[in-house]
From Swiss-Prot:
Coiled coil: none annotated. One of its GO terms (molecular function) is UDP-N-acetylmuramate-L-alanine ligase activity. Cell wall formation. Pathway: Cell wall biogenesis; peptidoglycan biosynthesis. The keyword Magnesium does not apply. It comes from Trichlorobacter lovleyi (strain ATCC BAA-1151 / DSM 17278 / SZ). The lineage of its organism: Bacteria, Pseudomonadati, Thermodesulfobacteriota, Desulfuromonadia, Geobacterales. Gene3D superfamilies: Mur ligase, C-terminal domain, Mur-like, catalytic domain, NAD(P)-binding Rossmann-like Domain. The keyword Transmembrane does not apply. The gene is murC. This is UDP-N-acetylmuramate--L-alanine ligase. It catalyses: UDP-N-acetyl-alpha-D-muramate + L-alanine + ATP = UDP-N-acetyl-alpha-D-muramoyl-L-alanine + ADP + phosphate + H(+).
Length: 456
């Protein structure tokens, strides 16, 4: 970065999006400090890398800092934000700092309402295996890396582009991937789905004339915006109309296999260890990026064979007494359908016991009708109270009402357990040999899964 920027402070440094950028900056030699509300594996890792980490937000945490970085979860009344403005220290959003990192490299930005983290992780794995050695910033922990970030020596930076507040428009990627477009974050996108589509068009058209947009042809909303795309693009999907196509899809437990074809030519078979038809599309997006960078197909195949998954994406927490406990980040109705569909297709004979923690009052309200019909692949459904994520309750919006409505819409076995801490004992009392238990949600529901494993 130009000038005398030496020390960078992150408010909410323990967040998955913030910590990755902080780690890359530490590895680049910058002084990094930050604060978070609680200790975690992430804060411990950053501290071990040389970061100055404070627990709790306070004005005195800002010691000789040159810039303050905030996430979307940080409010304007945060004491560190107030102090920074008082000292006339620049306060910038996380995406602006990511854009600065991307400016130093050729950026590969993976965007979309769903599938960003998995696709970014696949791209990072395949390109690393191919010797491209990209810098990596992911919204989840890549299992083979043990982290969500890495400073590479190559020319490319692979990053997840978060559309939740429109700030991904600060990025200027050379390659832009859009996995899908769906209604979400409607507290920000008050214009609804049409505003979301407009924003994605703007994002895609930021690609330079020599770059590429990689677009999923299976997504109706992407198909609707294709006539507005002004840059070179490649489509992928299951249709014969897609530039990059998958056929002969096989889903067997955790193993997913398909045959890839590019513009009518058979490339060969790709196989990886992550279940679900939706991950075939994520793998195609990754393959498209690799082909654009002239990675030989055999290297692409080898990279997928090494893919070890990503944290909180159909992650097995343990298996005891014939009961498998899985955790997944899915918190949008489309993601829930995809995850439960993956479990149903991969293990068709096993009973699925699903514990779901809704994430945010605003999302639960805006997508309520979709939520009540997205759990049909679950044999047993348990709902617990909404994870607020700093939001205030909305009258009439509750997990208890969601449980009532899912039951009214045909879900046969639905139970509401108000306190998440009561879930492990409840689940331990109802599960039996052969069950698959899936904890779902973007909050702290994963803790219930870990506690359940200890009780089995």
């Amino acid at each position: 970065m130009y000038g005398n920027i030496e020390k960078i402070h992150f408010v909410g440094i323990g967040g998955i999006g913030m910590s990755g950028i902080a780690e890359v900056l530490l590895n680049l030699g910058y002084q990094v400090s930050g604060s978070d509300l609680r200790e975690s594996d992430t804060t411990e890792r950053l501290r071990s890398l040389g970061g100055e980490i404070c627990i709790g937000h306070a004005a005195e945490n800002l010691t000789n800092v040159d810039v303050v970085v905030t996430s979307t979860a940080v409010q304007s009344d945060n004491p560190e934000v107030i102090e920074a403005k008082h000292r006339m220290v620049p306060v910038i959003p996380r995406a602006e700092m990511l854009a600065e990192l991307m400016r130093m490299k050729y950026g590969i930005a993976i965007a979309g309402t769903h599938g960003k983290t998995t696709t970014t992780s696949m791209v990072a794995t395949v390109l690393t295996h191919a010797g491209i050695d990209p810098t990596i910033v992911i919204g989840g922990k890549l299992n083979t890396l043990g982290s969500n970030a890495k400073l590479g020596q190559g020319k490319f930076l692979v990053a997840e582009a978060d559309e939740s507040d429109g700030s991904f428009l600060t990025l200027s990627p050379t390659i832009a991937v859009v996995t899908n477009i769906d209604a979400d974050h409607l507290d920000y996108y008050t214009g609804g789905l049409e505003q979301i589509k407009d924003t994605f068009v703007s994002f895609i058209n930021k690609v330079p004339f020599y770059g590429l947009a990689v677009l999923c042809q299976e997504d109706r909303n992407i198909n609707e915006i294709i006539p507005r795309i002004k840059k070179r693009f490649m489509t992928y999907g299951l249709s014969s109309q897609a530039d990059l196509r998958a056929t002969h899809v096989k889903l067997d437990g955790f193993q997913t296999t398909f045959t890839a074809h590019y513009k009518g030519y058979r490339l060969g078979e790709i196989s990886f260890n992550m279940p679900g038809a939706h991950n075939v599309l994520n793998a195609l997006a990754c393959t498209a990026v690799a082909l654009e960078l002239d990675v030989p197909f055999d290297k692409i195949q080898e990279g997928f064979a090494q893919f070890g998954g990503v944290g909180r994406r159909f992650t097995v927490k343990g298996e005891k007494n014939g009961i498998m406990v899985v955790d997944d980040y899915g918190h949008h109705p489309a993601e829930i359908r995809a995850t439960l569909g993956a479990a149903r297709n991969g293990w068709p004979e096993r009973r699925l016991v699903v514990a779901f923690q809704p994430h945010r009052y605003s999302r639960t309200k805006e997508l309520f009708n979709e939520f009540v019909t997205c759990f049909y692949d679950a044999d047993v459904l348990v709902l617990t109270d909404i994870y607020a994520a700093s939001e205030q309750p909305i009258p009439g919006v509750s997990a208890e009402r969601l449980a009532e409505e899912t039951r009214r819409h045909g879900q046969r076995d639905v139970t509401y357990i108000a306190d998440r801490n009561d879930l492990p004992d409840y689940l331990a009392g109802i599960v039996k040999e052969g069950d698959i238990v899936i904890t779902l949600g973007a909050g702290n529901i994963w803790q219930a899964g870990e506690a359940l494993v200890k009780r089995l």
